[in-house]
Amino acid sequence: TAWTFLKAMQKCSKKREARGSREAPETNFPDTTEESAQQICCTRDSSDSKSVPRSERNKKGIQCQGEGSSRGSQPGQFVGVTYNLEKRPTTIVLINDTPLNVLLDTGADTSVLTTAHYNRLKYRGRKYQGTGIIGVGGNVETFSTPVTIKKKGRHIKTRMLVADIPVTILGRDILQDLGAKLVLAQLSKEIKFRKIELKEGTMGPKIPQWPLTKEKLEGAKEIVQRLLSEGKISEASDNNPYNSPIFVIKKRSGKWRLLQDLRELNKTVQVGTEISRGLPHPGGLIKCKHMTVLDIGDAYFTIPLDPEFRPYTAFTIPSINHQEPDKRYVWNCLPQGFVLSPYIYQKTLQEILQPFRERYPEVQLYQYMDDLFVGSNGSKKQHKELIIELRAILLEKGFETPDDKLQEVPPYSWLGYQLCPENWKVQKMQLDMVKNPTLNDVQKLMGNITWMSSGVPGLTVKHIAATTKGCLELNQKVIWTEEAQKELEENNEKIKNAQGLQYYNPEEEMLCEVEITKNYEATYVIKQSQGILWAGKKIMKANKGWSTVKNLMLLLQHVATESITRVGKCPTFKVPFTKEQVMWEMQKGWYYSWLPEIVYTHQVVHDDWRMKLVEEPTSGITIYTDGGKQNGEGIAAYVTSNGRTKQKRLGPVTHQVAERMAIQMALEDTRDKQVNIVTDSYYCWKNITEGLGLEGPQSPWWPIIQNIREKEIVYFAWVPGHKGICGNQLADEAAKIKEEIMLAYQGTQIKEKRDEDAGFDLCVPYDIMIPVSDTKIIPTDVKIQVPPNSFGWVTGKSSMAKQGLLINGGIIDEGYTGEIQVICTNIGKSNIKLIEGQKFAQLIILQHHSNSRQPWDENKISQRGDKGFGSTGVFWVENIQEAQDEHENWHTSPKILARNYKIPLTVAKQITQECPHCTKQGSGPAGCVMRSPNHWQADCTHLDNKIILTFVESNSGYIHATLLSKENALCTSLAILEWARLFSPKSLHTDNGTNFVAEPVVNLLKFLKIAHTTGIPYHPESQGIVERANRTLKEKIQSHRDNTQTLEAALQLALITCNKGRESMGGQTPWEVFITNQAQVIHEKLLLQQAQSSKKFCFYKIPGEHDWKGPTRVLWKGDGAVVVNDEGKGIIAVPLTRTKLLIKPN
């Protein structure tokens, strides 16, 4: 009973006082399964309340009916005055400065003073007419008198009835003024509540309660009555406008459970940093002789909620057919589903347990939510005393640890694991799959396997995961394959034969062994001499630019981080690859932050061919490959440096397949052990040099890998769009292009021309001024190797001849391999200035025999048109000054300058780089953001102590900005109204700033029918676009500050520069892209209006499939999807993003 416990605690307290120590009491706890006495507690309402706290009572020497006060292991820590209801709850109060022993009666509405006590008062007031009291003995006559009551520093003046009754009664009228409460639950007033605040500018939830069925309503009322009687909830005040709906579910036991939807409230609460970053793992426990697992009952209901925050937790109990007004309540303790409940609970429990941890640093005490693990190496008696003391500390604060959930005998169930003193296991689980599984069933199965993989080495999920490919809805049926069933059976066999894993020994080093399964899953185990501590697995990424070694190197970092988190040390790694492979990866290793200590064993299967790839050209043969399509048929071709060519028709294949087959064909045909492969396919080059590594014999890349294995060294090079080797060209053209590739690949001052133009352009290496009648020799870094039976001819360009520049380059013989120099003479009337990068001469490769003639006919057409001689270039030098003026005024981007003034992009970039305001400052981190027409992002930025609200359209980059006087809801709303008046936004994305999430702004956006979402900077679906726009806008504002008097003027000029003076998509300005999009929207609306009366048709693509289907009739079209009748799957819904609507086809 509670009396036995209190007496035992008093006895232990006296023993500790006699010893002068702070040891735990040695008494046992009362059996909570037996009928325990109810208790009445006088507790404090707030920090300044002085009504009947136990600590105050002990200082005064006041006890209840001779009952001794009970202390726990911490002096000065008390729950309050506790009265066993087997005896009368009495206390001593001062009435008119007279100490009187009174009865606490929470069932009495009015306090009554006995006649005997009235006569003992030091001073008495006037008598007033009283009211009759109807009791067991009949009607009792009374009169009332004014009294002054003092208790623990609190004074109240009131009237009490005086009657001839056996004992003075303090009823609810005076008990309430004294701050006393009847508490039947564990809600502890000894625990100080934590302050909870709403985000600035937000309000509490006001969501109406939805109807509940009669059965659920009866269950809810029953639960509410119990919570109300236990003090866990209270009736809401009449002026409380907040509400969050409740719902009721039935548990497996048949009992009802009340839940509250607090999602809207959670959005408005100021949330701090998460303090529980993961579950503790048994592999990190240190082996100990004795263990105990405790469970804290009704954990949330023990901790009081901030009284100022309680109104926001209000909920409503409705009635059937509005039979009576709704009843409304608020939570007094932490509610389930509240975002801060876990944080407050764990933080509170952490502070309570901290003194225990400091006293016993050698004891392992793990706290995760309401589960506690205690491990020690002392005697069994000492361990038991530790548990008794720990339970006493918790009970003093109101936390009960029920005996029925106290685990003192192995095996112990803890966080899904089974613990024994010698080893640990994952709790036994049989993996089963239903006959016709859905996506949800498979995902649950994969979650169970992933959970068990840390305790059962070797579990795999690759084939099981493959069954979910193409499935989007949770209830969608999946095709359960034989491979998946076999993998499931193998996993069950491993679980059945799983052995217990070991605990961590801090005196020994750890070893991590990594292996690769036949399914290309990386598995690992962490070991010490006593055995395996834990295990894990990771599905390796294939065909994503991730080689096997790269996968494993990143896995090492993951395991090292995991190990440091669990035991504070990094293990030594035993890996299935060589040091050479690691060094090869380290050359590309920007993704490696550090490497742990590694023990190398052997090479990874299927990855040794990578060691044959080199970074520099070899001395062997060079082969140029290309693939293409002609009339729907793929063609692969290659040409070697010794003049050999080959073409092969491939049938109906993709362009990428043709490129890959050309490389495969070149490797197969050459006998050389050292080979240089040059391709213009970035796809093939990237895959071969970085992307492969997990391929087997079934892979289309396998022949290339096998051929690389047979070589000594292979060099792969990529050149962008080299000429010639295309599907419809002959072998002799391929040979010619080989030489052009060689010319184009040498030096930086040689540029390709149009396909129909001969030769290459030579560029000026640096700025040169050529006076009138002066001759200069201009060097270049261009080197060529003239092919056999050919010569090179350096000559002038017509655009240079217009200015009077005469080129005397001359002939380059077949054997010449030096740098090209160009002799230039100014025969004009003014000085000529040549700018770096300017095309001033050309190089043409000719055969020795070129006397063939061909008649002219009408088929001779040209990309040049009929402009003739001198029309290749424009005399753009004259436009440089105008372009410089343009950039000085508007800070226009290089591409816009080049387009508007017909100057080379190199010159435009030089103009921009000479501007001190337009120097590039780098860019922020990239994010994954939504981009679509009429989808905007907004953010506030600060410059010169002023606030700028920036809107940017995500598709075009068009910027609209305005100055705000204050960063509040009112100013933001006015700016949004102006923005909505000028444009037609459909959606807006902002951060979680107080002005954006304020209720007026949210309601305004709803009224304007603008979808509003929020996020975190540089996070997926965030406002990364507007962040970059803010940086650009600030740069442009600073560029214009020298020419303006106010920030407002500079802002407007900067907006003109950003929207009309820089390029966006396709070389157009953001303004042009935005206007084009709006015109297209209007055009599409007109087309839809015209097609409104006709039946709609569409092409569509089913998720998980690659081919388009249709055209087919649209049965129904909604805002986000269409319904069509598919031949294979029947009537289905297809997202609009996977459809192309059209009018009925002919």
UniProtKB/Swiss-Prot annotation:
Basic and acidic residues bias: start-end ranges: 45-59
Keyword Cytoplasm: no
This protein's name: Pol polyprotein
GO MF, one annotated term: exoribonuclease H activity
First and last residues of each zinc finger (Integrase-type): 878-919
Residue positions of the active site: 105
InterPro entries (UniProt xref): Aspartic_peptidase_AS (IPR001969), DNA/RNA_pol_sf (IPR043502), dUTPase-like (IPR029054), dUTPase-like_sf (IPR036157), dUTPase_trimeric (IPR033704), Integrase-like_N (IPR017856), Integrase_C_dom_sf_retrovir (IPR036862), Integrase_C_retrovir (IPR001037)
Gene: pol
Keyword field: Aspartyl protease, Cleavage on pair of basic residues, DNA integration, DNA recombination, DNA-binding, Endonuclease, Hydrolase, Metal-binding, Multifunctional enzyme, Nuclease, Nucleotidyltransferase, Protease, RNA-directed DNA polymerase, Transferase, Viral genome integration, Virus entry into host cell, Zinc, Zinc-finger
Catalytic activity: Endohydrolysis of RNA in RNA/DNA hybrids. Three different cleavage modes: 1. sequence-specific internal cleavage of RNA. Human immunodeficiency virus type 1 and Moloney murine leukemia virus enzymes prefer to cleave the RNA strand one nucleotide away from the RNA-DNA junction. 2. RNA 5'-end directed cleavage 13-19 nucleotides from the RNA end. 3. DNA 3'-end directed cleavage 15-20 nucleotides away from the primer terminus; 3'-end directed exonucleolytic cleavage of viral RNA-DNA hybrid; DNA(n) + a 2'-deoxyribonucleoside 5'-triphosphate = DNA(n+1) + diphosphate
EC number: 3.4.23.-, 2.7.7.49, 3.1.26.13, 3.1.13.2
Positions of the UniProt region annotated as Disordered: 13-77
Biological source species: Equine infectious anemia virus (isolate CL22) (EIAV)
A Pfam entry, by short name: RVT_thumb
